[in-house]
Amino acid sequence: HLLSRRQRQMCIRDSEYTKDSKVETSSIVVEPYTSKILAIIGGKDYASSQFNRATQANRQIGSTIKPLLYYLALENGFTPATTFLCEPTTFKLDDNSTYSPSNFNDKYAYKDVTLAQAIAVSDNIFAVKTHLFLGTDNLASLIKKFGIKDVKTNASLALGTLNTNIYNLANMYNCLASEGKYNHLYTIEKITNDAGKVLY
């Protein structure tokens, strides 16, 4: 496949620049609608490390969670023009604790911003306000539908404090790319015997 071949070429090229570096990366390319995995890369050199970072390395996913949050918002009456005030904010939570997230580089609009603007600049204040408005259980429940079990229901979930791997992240994003159609990602289409009979 042209795309997966191009991806492999890019990884080989990049590895030439980082031969002496210990930095690793991973990547998955998925075909929307079919959920077919076209390419998966778990590291730059299988000979030196068989650890598959695409499926085994769990990390906080950060702002990549926001499209899922805003999908929920749109499903619950928000529009791209829905606004919240963007300014430094301390949130008082149900357990009487407080939470004070910040925007990247402490940059704030100090005025109402729209959902469309918020996702364009990855505004954290807007994300947390949206998350708390919807109820923290909603985002956690959506994530669990993708088979991710250990999801903490808290305010910071809106900013991607979820620990998971890019296989699971690709699984979630593929559902969005497939217009809501959800199928598990797969690498094997079928298995045949030497007579061509389909065994799987």
Where on the chain are the PLM-derived regions?
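Conserved catalytic neighborhood of penicillin-recognizing serine enzymes
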Residues: F78-L139, Y182, D194-Y200
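Single conserved hydrophobic/aromatic residue that forms the stacking wall/gate
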Residues: H1-I12
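Active-site SXXK
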Residues: S35, N58-C86, A118, M172-L176
